[in-house]
Amino acid sequence: MRKMNPRLALGIALVALGTIMRVLPHPWNLTPVGAVSLFSGACFDRKRWAFAVPFATMFVSDTLLEIFTGHGYHSLMPVIYATFALIVVLGMIVRGKRDSALVVGSGAVASATIFYVVSNFAVWTASTMYPRTLAGLIACYVAAIPFYGTMLLGDVVYSALLFGTFVWAERRLPQFAEAK
């Protein structure tokens, strides 16, 4: 019987963690999905896994939320998924410096900021909650500040946990060492 690749096992575990954390009750946006997206881009050798892990996390959790609450699927899903794809690309940019707390912390702040800017611009353009004026756009961003705060907290904390644990494992466990 063939052993499972440790990085593949990690990907599956991340999908499970992200799904569980999104489905369980939590403060808005305080989930590991942004951190998982950043981490996936930085730590998975294959691009398909880097994108598949956060997309699978979102799709499985969105489906469960739709089944159990009726609020999993919505019209802005393509924008949300595209935003997480941008965060995966950001992770690919920080890949070579994933053992730097400053780089990972900056990446986490950038990922929350990217999500805040893109998703709220999409809300402003696609909904009737705000007038299509500069004042309406500003009102949309101001109303979303609390969500940005919890996303920022989640991205920073979960990124520290994910990257810290992974860098430790790469240094201590040969099966996690990056192939040279």
Say what each PLM segment does.
Residues 1-43, 48-49:
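Hydrophobic transmembrane alpha-helices
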Residues 1-4, 173-180:
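Short, charged juxtamembrane terminal tails flanking transmembrane helices
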Residues 8-13, 48-52, 77-82, 105-109, ...:
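Hydrophobic alpha-helical transmembrane segments
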Residues 20-21, 40-47, 86-98, 165-173:
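Structural signal for the C-terminal ends of transmembrane alpha-helices
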Residues 20-31, 57-90:
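Interfacial aromatic-anchored transmembrane helix boundaries in multi-pass membrane proteins
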Residues 33-37, 71-79, 104, 137-141:
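Non-cytosolic membrane-interface motifs at loop->transmembrane helix junctions
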Residues 50-60, 104-112, 179:
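Central hydrophobic cores of alpha-helical transmembrane segments
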Residues 98-171, 176:
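Membrane-embedded alpha-helical hairpins and interfacial helices in multi-pass inner-membrane proteins
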